[in-house]
C-alpha cells in the first residue's frame, strides 16, 4: 500500500488530517513492524492489515475529542491508540498524552516510538493503579483491548470521577458489558459506531459515579 493510498484512507477517518501527521503514522507503522519481529506487540494474525486494523481503528478516536489537549491512555500495549493519538497531538500547541504500560519491553518500544516520531507522549512503565495520584486528571482517557468495561471503570475511576471523559473501544459484546457495569456504576453514555469494524463501537463515557447501597 503506497503512502498516498494510506493518506487517502486516513482522510476518510479524519478529513482534516495533515500530510505531516500521516507521514508520522506511516513511520510508526514501519517502526512497529520492525519491533514486532523481536517482541509481541500485537496478534501476528493482524499484522498483514496493520494500517486498517490498528492505525485507522485508533485514529478514529481523535475527532471525538479533537479540542482536548490532555490525554491519558491506559494499558497502552503497542501504542494503539496512544501513539496514534500522540501523532495527532504533535501539531496541537500544548498537547500531550500520558501512556501507562506495565510490561517493560512494550514500554521501551513506546519510548522509542515517541522519540523517533517526535511526538508529545510521556511513557510510564507502571501499573495503572500506581499512577492514580501521579498523573493529573486529563480531559480524555482511552483504552483499547484492555479489560471489561466494569474493570476499566475501576482502573480509571480517579480520573473519570474527577471530570475526565472516556473513549473506550469495544467489540461485539459491548452491550452486555454496558448492562453488567450499570449494576455498580452510573454514567452518561454515547455510543459511536466504529468506522472500521461494523461489530464494534466507541463508548464515550462521562459523569462516572460508583453506586452506593
From Swiss-Prot:
GO terms for cellular component: cytosol. It is found in: Cytoplasm. Gene3D superfamilies: Vaccinia Virus protein VP39. S-adenosyl-L-methionine binds at residues 75, 80, 128-129, 144. Belongs to the methyltransferase superfamily. RNA methyltransferase RsmG family. Specifically methylates the N7 position of guanine in position 527 of 16S rRNA. This is Ribosomal RNA small subunit methyltransferase G. It comes from Brucella canis (strain ATCC 23365 / NCTC 10854 / RM-666).
Amino acid at each position: 500500500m503506497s503512502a498516498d493510498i494510506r493518506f487517502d484512507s486516513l482522510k476518510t477517518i479524519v478529513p482534516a488530517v495533515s500530510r505531516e501527521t500521516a507521514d508520522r503514522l506511516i513511520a510508526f507503522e514501519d517502526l512497529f513492524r520492525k519491533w514486532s519481529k523481536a517482541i509481541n506487540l500485537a496478534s501476528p494474525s493482524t499484522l498483514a492489515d496493520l494500517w486498517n486494523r490498528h492505525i485507522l481503528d485508533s485514529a478514529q478516536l481523535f475527532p471525538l475529542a479533537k479540542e482536548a489537549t490532555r490525554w491519558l491512555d491506559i494499558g497502552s500495549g503497542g501504542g494503539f491508540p496512544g501513539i496514534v493519538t500522540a501523532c495527532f497531538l504533535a501539531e496541537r500547541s500544548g498537547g500531550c498524552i500520558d501512556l501507562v504500560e506495565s510490561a517493560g519491553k512494550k514500554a521501551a518500544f513506546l519510548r522509542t516510538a515517541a522519540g523517533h516520531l517526535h511526538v508529545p507522549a510521556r511513557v510510564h512503565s507502571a501499573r495503572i493503579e500506581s499512577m492514580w495520584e501521579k498523573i493529573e486528571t486529563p480531559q480524555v482517557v482511552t483504552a483499547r483491548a484492555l479489560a471489561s468495561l466494569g474493570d476499566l471503570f475501576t482502573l480509571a475511576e480517579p480520573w473519570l470521577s474527577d471530570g475526565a471523559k472516556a473513549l473506550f473501544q469495544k467489540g461485539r459484546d459491548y452491550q452486555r458489558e454496558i448492562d453488567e457495569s450499570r449494576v455498580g456504576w452510573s454514567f452518561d453514555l454515547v455510543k459511536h459506531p466504529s468506522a472500521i469494524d461494523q461489530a464494534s463501537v466507541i463508548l464515550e463515557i462521562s459523569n462516572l459515579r460508583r453506586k452506593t447501597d
